C-alpha cells in the first residue's frame, strides 16, 4: 500500500461521556475489557499492512503521545505511530519517554480540516515521497477492518474521494452524517446530522482522499467563512465541485462511541450469543499479560467477559470486568462495565452501570429491545 498516508484524528475531552470522560482523554477510554477506543483504528491500520499512522491531536497531546509511544511503538515490527513535528524526539527514545518536546510553533486548530492544514508537511508525505492518498480515521470508533480492499477499489475507480458508509435504522440517522448515492455508486448527497433524514445510509467516518485533490480544496477553503471541518466543509465542497466521490459499504460491525449510553450499549453487544466483536478480534493493549475469557456460565459469573486476575467473591452477570478489579462478598453486578482496578464493595448490587477506577458509579440506560447502531 505504498503511497497511502494514514492520518488519525484524535480529539480530546469526551464531555458527552460524563464521569467516564472526566479527567481522561476520550481516545484512551477503556473498551471491551481489552483496549482503549483509539487502539481499534491503530490496529486496523497495522492489520491493513500500512507502515505507520500519523497522529493529529491537540488536547493534552503530550499525555496521549506518551501513552501511545509506550503501548504501540516498538511492539510491532515494521509499524509505528508517527507524531509529526514531535516524532524525531520520540524516535530517539525507544521504549522510554523523551524528557522534553520541541516548542509548539503552529496555531491552534479549530477543527479536523485545520489539523490537516497546519500539519500539511507531515500529512501529505509518505516516507520520503509525496503521498498519493490520504486515509482519514478517527479515534473513537470501534470496529475491525482491513482498508486494503477499499484502497484498491478507490485506485481502480480513479475517484477523488471514497467515503465509507453503513446502513442503519432511519430513526437514528439524525445522529450521523447522512449520505445518498446514485445507481452507479456515486455520492449525490452528504448532510451532517440532518433534521429530516431521507436516507438510511450514514457516513462511517473514515474516508480515502486523492492527496492532491484534498490539498487543493483545503487551500481553497482556507481564509473563507468555514467551519474548519472535513465533514461540514471539505466533503460538501468536493461534492459541489463535481468531484468523483464513491462509496464503500461497511458490512461488518462499526460503532461510533459518542455518548456514555452508546458506550454501555456497545459492551452489551460483545456479550451476545453472536457477539458484535469476538475477544480475539479486539486489540489487547490494557494489561496484555492478563488473559481474558468470555464466560458463558460458572460459579459467580455468567455471560460475561472477565479478566483472569479479577478477585470475585460475588456474582457477575452480563458484564465486562477489566483486569485488577474486585467484586466484593455478596456483591452483584449485572449489565455493568467494571474498569481496571475498580472495587465493588461487599453487598453492593449494581445494574446497568459503569464502575470507574476510583469505585464511583455512573448509571446508564437499562437494557431494552433495541437494534444497535
UniProtKB/Swiss-Prot annotation:
Pfam families: NTP_transferase. Disruption phenotype: Cells lacking this gene are unable to produce both validoxylamine A and validamycin A. One of its GO terms (biological process) is glycogen biosynthetic process. It is an enzyme of class 2 (transferase). Keywords: GTP-binding, Magnesium, Metal-binding, Nucleotide-binding, Nucleotidyltransferase, Transferase. It catalyses: valienol 1-phosphate + GTP + H(+) = GDP-valienol + diphosphate. Its EC number is 2.7.7.91. GO terms for molecular function: glucose-1-phosphate adenylyltransferase activity; GTP binding; metal ion binding. Its cofactor is Mg(2+). It comes from the Bacteria. Can also use Mn(2+) and Co(2+). SUPFAM superfamilies: Nucleotide-diphospho-sugar transferases. Involved in the biosynthesis of the antifungal agent validamycin A. Catalyzes the conversion of valienol 1-phosphate to GDP-valienol. Also able to use efficiently ATP as nucleotidyl donor, but other NDP derivatives are less efficient. PANTHER family: GLUCOSE-1-PHOSPHATE ADENYLYLTRANSFERASE LARGE SUBUNIT 1, CHLOROPLASTIC-RELATED (PTHR43523:SF12), GLUCOSE-1-PHOSPHATE ADENYLYLTRANSFERASE-RELATED (PTHR43523). This is Valienol-1-phosphate guanylyltransferase. It comes from Streptomyces hygroscopicus subsp. jinggangensis (strain 5008).
Amino acid at each position: 500500500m505504498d503511497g497511502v498516508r494514514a492520518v488519525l484524528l484524535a480529539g480530546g475531552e469526551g464531555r458527552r461521556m460524563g464521569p467516564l470522560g472526566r479527567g481522561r482523554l476520550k481516545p484512551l477510554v477503556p473498551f471491551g475489557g481489552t483496549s482503549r477506543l483509539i487502539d481499534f483504528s491503530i490496529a486496523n491500520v497495522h492489520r491493513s499492512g500500512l507502515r505507520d499512522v500519523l497522529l493529529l491531536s491537540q488536547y493534552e497531546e503530550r499525555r496521549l503521545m506518551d501513552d501511545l509511544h509506550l503501548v504501540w511503538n516498538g511492539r510491532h515490527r515494521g509499524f509505528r505511530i508517527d507524531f509529526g513535528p514531535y516524532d524525531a524526539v520520540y524516535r530517539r527514545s525507544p521504549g522510554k519517554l523523551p524528557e522534553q518536546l520541541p516548542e509548539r510553533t503552529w496555531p491552534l486548530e479549530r477543527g479536523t480540516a485545520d489539523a490537516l492544514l497546519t500539519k500539511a508537511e507531515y500529512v501529505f508525505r509518505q516516507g520520503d515521497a509525496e503521498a498519493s492518498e490520504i486515509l482519514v480515521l478517527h479515534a473513537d470508533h470501534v470496529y475491525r477492518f482491513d482498508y486494503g480492499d477499499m484502497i484498491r477499489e478507490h485506485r481502480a475507480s480513479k475517484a477523488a474521494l471514497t467515503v465509507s458508509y453503513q446502513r442503519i435504522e432511519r430513526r437514528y440517522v439524525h445522529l450521523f452524517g447522512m449520505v445518498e448515492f446514485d445507481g452507479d455508486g456515486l455520492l449525490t448527497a452528504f448532510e451532517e446530522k440532518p433534521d429530516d433524514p431521507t436516507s438510511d445510509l450514514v457516513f462511517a467516518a473514515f474516508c480515502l482522499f486523492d492527496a492532491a485533490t484534498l490539498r487543493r480544496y483545503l487551500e481553497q477553503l482556507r481564509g473563507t467563512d468555514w467551519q474548519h471541518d472535513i465533514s461540514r466543509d471539505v466533503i460538501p465542497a468536493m461534492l459541489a465541485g463535481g468531484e468523483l466521490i464513491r462509496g464503500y459499504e461497511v458490512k461488518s460491525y462499526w460503532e461510533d462511541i459518542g455518548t456514555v449510553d452508546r458506550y454501555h450499549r456497545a459492551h452489551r453487544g460483545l456479550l451476545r450469543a453472536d457477539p458484535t466483536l469476538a475477544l480475539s478480534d479486539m486489540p489487547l493493549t490494557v494489561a496484555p499479560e492478563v488473559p481474558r475469557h468470555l464466560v458463558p456460565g460458572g460459579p459467580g459469573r455468567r455471560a460475561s467477559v472477565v479478566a483472569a486476575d479479577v478477585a470475585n467473591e460475588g456474582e457477575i452477570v452480563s458484564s465486562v470486568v477489566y483486569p485488577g478489579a474486585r467484586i466484593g462478598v455478596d456483591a452483584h453486578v449485572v449489565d455493568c462495565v467494571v474498569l481496571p482496578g475498580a472495587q465493588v464493595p461487599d453487598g453492593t448490587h449494581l445494574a446497568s452501570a459503569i464502575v470507574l477506577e476510583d469505585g464511583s458509579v455512573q448509571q446508564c440506560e437499562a437494557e431494552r429491545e433495541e437494534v444497535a447502531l
